[in-house]
C-alpha cells in the first residue's frame, strides 16, 4: 500500500479542504448563532468589544499550528522565522502605541499577565495592595478565591461611602502601616481617572513597586482619551480585547530593562510554555489599527458616549455610582428601584441589550444577585453609535428596569418587545460583519 492510498486512513477525505459547515455542523451552528447574537443585540458589557475582520482572520490563521517556545531569535523550536516576524511586529507596535521601552506580548490572558508580574516581583506570603473587589477591583488584585489572595497577603483599599471615589488618604495610610512590596492601581468597575502620580508617590514612600493594570482603559490611553500610567508606573499590564479592540490576551509593559528581563523570565518559562502565535499575530494587527489616526477619534467617542449614556440613565431615574464616568464604563445602582442586578441582566437580555450584573460599593446582596449592573460603550462605539444613539439606549434601559420594578423578575413583556424592536432598528442601521 502506497502513502497516497494510505492517506485516507490517517485523515478523512477533505481534511485540508472541507469547511466547518460540513466538517462539524454542530459547532458551525453554534458559531452562526453567536454571530447572529452579536449582530442583532447591543453589547453593553464593558469588558467586551467587536474586533475587525482582520483581527478575526489573524486569530484563525495557520499560526494555530505553530509551537514557538522562547522569544524572537531565541526559540527552542525550528521553523519560527515567521513567528518571529509577527511577535516582533507586536512588540514594536505596543512600544510605540504606549510610549514605553519594553513589551512582552506573550501572556495568554489578563490573569496570566498579572500572575507573571507577581512571580517576577514577589515571594509567596509577601504583602501587596489592590482595589477591593467590592469597590470595583479585579479577582487577580487580591480576591481570597484567587491565587493572588491565596499565595500572597492582600491589603485591600476601597472607595469612600459618600462619593464612591478612591480614598487616597486611606491608600497612603494602609501603605505606611503595612509596607507592601507591590501596589496595584486599576480595576474592573471603577469609572473615574486614577491618580497615577499620587500612587507612585505613595509607592516610593514605602519602597513598593507600582503596577498599573489598565486592562479596561488601555484603548483610551492608546487613543489619548485617558492619562497614561507612564512614566509613573514601574510596570503596566493590560488585556487586549476590551477598549483596545484586539484578541483576547494580555501584555506587560515597562521602561525598566532589568524588570523587563524579570517579566520575560516570569512569562516563559515561569508561567507559560509555547505562546499562542496566532493570537500574537492578531495582537500585532490590533496594535497597528490603534496606531492609526481614526483610533484617536474612536477613543474620544467612547468617552463621549459613556457620558451621554450615564446622563440618559440618570434621566431615566436610575442612580450612577460616583455620579458619572470619566472612561468607558459606569455602574448603575438599582437599589432605589428594588430591582436586583440579576433580574436586570436577564430582563435587558430579553430586550436584546446585553450587560452584566455587578456589585456596587457596600452592596448588601451576594455577587450572584447584586444591586447593580455595569454598562460600557466600547462595542457600541465600534458599531458606529454616537451620543444620540446612547441617549436612546439609556432611555430604553430605564423602560426595562421600570417594568421589572412594577412586575418583578418577569418584567413587562410588552415593554421588552417594544425595546427589542428599537434595538433591531439600531442594529440594522449600524451592521457588523456583513460578509460573514
Curated annotation (Swiss-Prot):
Subcellular location: Cytoplasm
Pathway: One-carbon metabolism; tetrahydrofolate interconversion; Amino-acid biosynthesis; glycine biosynthesis; glycine from L-serine: step 1/1
Binding positions ((6S)-5,6,7,8-tetrahydrofolate): 133, 137-139, 366-368
EC number: 2.1.2.1
Cofactor: pyridoxal 5'-phosphate
GO-annotated biological processes: glycine biosynthetic process from serine; tetrahydrofolate interconversion
Residue positions, PTM N6-(pyridoxal phosphate)lysine: 242
Key words of the record: Amino-acid biosynthesis, Cytoplasm, One-carbon metabolism, Pyridoxal phosphate, Transferase
Single Gene Ontology MF annotation: glycine hydroxymethyltransferase activity
Site (Plays an important role in substrate specificity): 241
Reaction it catalyzes: (6R)-5,10-methylene-5,6,7,8-tetrahydrofolate + glycine + H2O = (6S)-5,6,7,8-tetrahydrofolate + L-serine
Pfam families in alphabetical order: SHMT (PF00464)
Cellular component, GO annotation: cytosol
Matching InterPro entries: PyrdxlP-dep_Trfase, PyrdxlP-dep_Trfase_major, PyrdxlP-dep_Trfase_small, Ser_HO-MeTrfase, Ser_HO-MeTrfase-like, Ser_HO-MeTrfase_PLP_BS, SHMT-like_dom
Alphabetized SUPFAM superfamilies for the sequence: PLP-dependent transferases
Keyword set includes Protein transport: no
Superkingdom classification of source: Bacteria
Main function: Catalyzes the reversible interconversion of serine and glycine with tetrahydrofolate (THF) serving as the one-carbon carrier. This reaction serves as the major source of one-carbon groups required for the biosynthesis of purines, thymidylate, methionine, and other important biomolecules. Also exhibits THF-independent aldolase activity toward beta-hydroxyamino acids, producing glycine and aldehydes, via a retro-aldol mechanism.
Annotated family: Belongs to the SHMT family.
Subunit architecture: Homodimer.
The name this protein goes by in its record: Serine hydroxymethyltransferase
Source organism: Novosphingobium aromaticivorans (strain ATCC 700278 / DSM 12444 / CCUG 56034 / CIP 105152 / NBRC 16084 / F199)
Amino acid at each position: 500500500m502506497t502513502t497516497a492510498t494510505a492517506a485516507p486512513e490517517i485523515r478523512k477525505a477533505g481534511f485540508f479542504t472541507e469547511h466547518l459547515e460540513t466538517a462539524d455542523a454542530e459547532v458551525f451552528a453554534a458559531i452562526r448563532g453567536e454571530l447572529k447574537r452579536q449582530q442583532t443585540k447591543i453589547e453593553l458589557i464593558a469588558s467586551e468589544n467587536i474586533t475587525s475582520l482582520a483581527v478575526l482572520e489573524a486569530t484563525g490563521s495557520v499560526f494555530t499550528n505553530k509551537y514557538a517556545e522562547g522569544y524572537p531569535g531565541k526559540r527552542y523550536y525550528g521553523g519560527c522565522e515567521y513567528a518571529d516576524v509577527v511577535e516582533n511586529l507586536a512588540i514594536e507596535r505596543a512600544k510605540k502605541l504606549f510610549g514605553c521601552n519594553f513589551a512582552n506580548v506573550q501572556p495568554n490572558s489578563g490573569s496570566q499577565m498579572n500572575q507573571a508580574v507577581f512571580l517576577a516581583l514577589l515571594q509567596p506570603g509577601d504583602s501587596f495592595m489592590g482595589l477591593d473587589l467590592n469597590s470595583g477591583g479585579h479577582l487577580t488584585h487580591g480576591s481570597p478565591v484567587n491565587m493572588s489572595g491565596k499565595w500572597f497577603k492582600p491589603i485591600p483599599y476601597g472607595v469612600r461611602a459618600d462619593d464612591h471615589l478612591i480614598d487616597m488618604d486611606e491608600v497612603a495610610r494602609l501603605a505606611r502601616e503595612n509596607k507592601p512590596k507591590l501596589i496595584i492601581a486599576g480595576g474592573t468597575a471603577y469609572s473615574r481617572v486614577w491618580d497615577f502620580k499620587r500612587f507612585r508617590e505613595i509607592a516610593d514612600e514605602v519602597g513598593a513597586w507600582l503596577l498599573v493594570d489598565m486592562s479596561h482603559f488601555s484603548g483610551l490611553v492608546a487613543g489619548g482619551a485617558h492619562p497614561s500610567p507612564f512614566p509613573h508606573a514601574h510596570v503596566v499590564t493590560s488585556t487586549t480585547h476590551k477598549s483596545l479592540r484586539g484578541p483576547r490576551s494580555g501584555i506587560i509593559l515597562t521602561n525598566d530593562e532589568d524588570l523587563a528581563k524579570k517579566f520575560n523570565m516570569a512569562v516563559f518559562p515561569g508561567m507559560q510554555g509555547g505562546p499562542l502565535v496566532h493570537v500574537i499575530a492578531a495582537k500585532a494587527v490590533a496594535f497597528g489599527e490603534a496606531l492609526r489616526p481614526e483610533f484617536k477619534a474612536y477613543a474620544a467617542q467612547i468617552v463621549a458616549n459613556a457620558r451621554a449614556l450615564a446622563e440618559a440613565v440618570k434621566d431615566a431615574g436610575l442612580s450612577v455610582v460616583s455620579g458619572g464616568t470619566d472612561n468607558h464604563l459606569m455602574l448603575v445602582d438599582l437599589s432605589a428601584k428594588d430591582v436586583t442586578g440579576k433580574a436586570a441582566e436577564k430582563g435587558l437580555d430579553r430586550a436584546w441589550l446585553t450587560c452584566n450584573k455587578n456589585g456596587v460599593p457596600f452592596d448588601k446582596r451576594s455577587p450572584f444577585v447584586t444591586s447593580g449592573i455595569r454598562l460600557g460603550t466600547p462595542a457600541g462605539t465600534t458599531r458606529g453609535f454616537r451620543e444620540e444613539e446612547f441617549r436612546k439606549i439609556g432611555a430604553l434601559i430605564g423602560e426595562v428596569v421600570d417594568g421589572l420594578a412594577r412586575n418583578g423578575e418577569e418584567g413587562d413583556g410588552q415593554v421588552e418587545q417594544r425595546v427589542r424592536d428599537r434595538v433591531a432598528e439600531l442594529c440594522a442601521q449600524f451592521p457588523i460583519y456583513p460578509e460573514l
